[in-house]
Swiss-Prot record:
Protein keywords: Acetylation, ATP-binding, Chaperone, Cytoplasm, Hydrolase, Isopeptide bond, Magnesium, Metal-binding, Nucleotide-binding, Phosphoprotein, Ubl conjugation
Domain of life, per lineage: Eukaryota
Species name: Mus musculus (Mouse)
GO cellular component terms, A-Z: acrosomal vesicle; cell body; chaperonin-containing T-complex; zona pellucida receptor complex
Binding site for ADP: 39, 91-94, 158-159, 411, 496
Positions of disulphide bridges: none
GO biological process: binding of sperm to zona pellucida
Subunit structure: Component of the chaperonin-containing T-complex (TRiC), a hexadecamer composed of two identical back-to-back stacked rings enclosing a protein folding chamber. Each ring is made up of eight different subunits: TCP1/CCT1, CCT2, CCT3, CCT4, CCT5, CCT6A/CCT6, CCT7, CCT8. Interacts with PACRG.
Functional description taken from the UniProt entry: Component of the chaperonin-containing T-complex (TRiC), a molecular chaperone complex that assists the folding of actin, tubulin and other proteins upon ATP hydrolysis. The TRiC complex mediates the folding of WRAP53/TCAB1, thereby regulating telomere maintenance.
Record-given protein name: T-complex protein 1 subunit zeta
PTM sites of type N6-acetyllysine: 5, 199, 287, 365, 377, 388
Entry's family note: Belongs to the TCP-1 chaperonin family.
Modified residues (N-acetylalanine): 2
Length: 531
């Protein structure tokens, strides 16, 4: 009888074999759900929420976030996989598959009486060897546009259909190349993702500038300005109450008039400064002048600015202030005391676009923009969400490739090569831990197997072909998903991120090891004692 039972008769306990069976069945269950959506030929899942909202996706991360998982072990695996996405942006489905398969392979040996500790020692040895081998097969190369496009395409094709993936690939790579500075880390926040419910998803495009999701607030302001100076500021151009609660007493109407005038004058002086600057830089030329303010602009000020032909946008989002100065140049001002032409940015074209009730302001044709916008278009909400998730992963894939300075061949090529290397390494491991290494090698093959299966080919036949080709040629050979034949992944431009594979080997081994070593599950928390 479990010791915990004597202390708490209501506790639920699962011992040794039962505990392991519970955990392994959870891992298998999760693996079966995600198995079919691995790779570019994977199938979609439809998630229907309690409110009846529909989400169509084959992104493992989105699925694991949205699915309500009751089983504690399964939710542990799901958390590991979503953490993988947070760190590297890819590899969630592979993560779940490999953990499930490691446990499945281990189960075969444990059912024959092998102790889990011995298998986990084998797993550790295999992981160390696999990481060494990964160092050998990684391909260090110049991260030019072609390579980055291959990396992004490999990632994006697993999230959305091929035609859309090709459109997004170019946009994603060009956006990263635009914001990239030498010897500085890439800041993905400098790529704004703006959505428009409009046209079809293949109209998604890269705007080399900014798109703001609001328009000018005055009917007389121009809807299109070419060759414009841009003043970015965070200065209030409306009457604001004083910070302390103060009251003014006046004896006559004249005094009240004076008070109102004094209050207005404060704002009018600021507006005059903008107008003077505009006259100074534009003169009589037809150059435009645009003010983008983070705070409010009241109707009087808008009117004064409109008369001078200045376009003014108020209440711009804070995150866009930094992006504006990076895209157009200039300096964001917090006061107008030292207002001079050096503070101004420049854009070749600023125009307003109205879509139903919504207005968008496009700031384009900037010289050498350091911040860009990906304009996501799609006919409905769930298409937009799907594209946004895909773009985020695509951006991360390109960033990882640049940060790593190297890539590894995809299409299951690395897994096949790793499995073969581990089988060769197996005899040098002492004792029964060899079985753990064998289990690890077999588990890695789940990736090429499932890739082939999802494409409609026989998984054993395809795997045998690929392994034979790998042994003969010595090259890293993956599965060609359109024919089911072996192919040299590097020649076809199928590349995966090195850091994703490295993270996969680490996290899968750690979690599988921990789950195998569980020999007792107790549900004896405070909540289960009530009743």
């Amino acid at each position: 009888m479990a010791a915990v039972k004597t202390l708490n008769p209501k506790a639920e306990v699962a011992r040794a074999q039962a505990a392991l069976a519970v955990n392994i069945s959870a891992a298998r269950g999760l693996q079966d759900v995600l198995r079919t959506n691995l790779g570019p030929k994977g199938t979609m899942k439809m998630l229907v929420s309690g409110a009846g909202d529909i989400k169509l996706t084959k992104d493992g991360n989105v699925l694991l976030h949205e699915m309500q998982i009751q089983h504690p072990t399964a939710s542990l695996i799901a958390k590991v996989a979503t953490a993988q996405d947070d760190i590297t942006g890819d590899g969630t489905t592979s993560n779940v598959l490999i953990i499930g398969e490691l446990l499945k392979q281990a189960d075969l040996y444990i059912s024959e009486g092998l102790h889990p500790r011995i298998i986990t020692e084998g797993f550790e040895a295999a992981k160390e060897k696999a990481l060494q081998f990964l160092e050998q097969v990684k391909v260090s190369k110049e991260m030019d546009r072609e390579t980055l496009i291959d990396v992004a395409r490999t990632s994006l094709r697993t999230k959305v259909h091929a035609e859309l993936a090709d459109v997004l690939t170019e946009a994603v790579v060009d956006s990263i190349l635009a914001i990239r500075k030498k010897d500085e880390p890439i800041d993905l926040f400098m790529v704004e993702i703006m959505e428009m419910k409009h046209k079809s998803e293949t109209d998604t495009s890269l705007i080399r500038g900014l798109v703001l999701d609001h328009g000018a607030r005055h009917p007389d302001m121009k809807k299109r300005v070419e060759n414009a100076y841009i003043l970015t500021c965070n200065v209030s151009l409306e009457y604001e109450k004083t910070e302390v609660n103060s009251g003014f007493f006046y004896k006559s109407a004249e005094e009240r008039e004076k008070l109102v005038k004094a209050e207005r004058k404060f704002i009018e002086d600021r507006v005059k400064k903008i107008i003077e600057l505009k006259k100074k830089v534009c003169g009589d030329s037809d150059k435009g002048f645009v003010v983008i303010n983070q705070k409010g602009i009241d109707p009087f000020s808008l009117d004064a600015l409109a008369k001078e032909g200045i376009v003014a946008l108020r209440r711009a989002k804070r995150r866009n202030m930094e992006r504006l100065t990076l895209a157009c140049g200039g300096i964001a001002l917090n006061s107008f005391d030292d207002l001079n032409p050096d503070c101004l940015g420049h854009a070749g074209l600023v125009y307003e676009y109205t879509l139903g009730e919504e207005k968008f302001t496009f700031i384009e044709k900037c010289n050498n923009p350091r911040s860009v916008t990906l304009l996501v278009k799609g006919p409905n909400k769930h298409t937009l969400t799907q594209i946004k998730d895909a773009i985020r992963d695509g951006l991360r894939a390109v960033k990882n490739a640049i940060d790593d300075g190297c890539v590894v061949p995809g299409a299951g090529a690395v897994e096949v090569a790793l499995a073969e290397a581990l089988i060769k390494y197996k005899p040098s491991v002492k004792g029964r831990a060899q079985l753990g290494v064998q289990a690890f090698a077999d588990a890695l093959l789940i990736i090429p197997k499932v890739l082939a299966q999802n494409s409609g080919f026989d998984l054993q036949e395809t795997l045998v072909k690929v392994q034979a080709e790998h042994s003969e040629s010595g090259q890293l050979v993956g599965v060609d998903l359109s024919t089911g034949e072996p192919m040299v992944a590097a020649e076809m431009g199928v590349w995966d991120n090195y850091c994703v594979k490295k993270q996969l080997l680490h996290s899968c081994t750690v979690i599988a090891t921990n789950i195998l070593l569980v020999d007792e599950i107790m549900r004896a928390g405070m909540s289960s004692l009530k009743g």
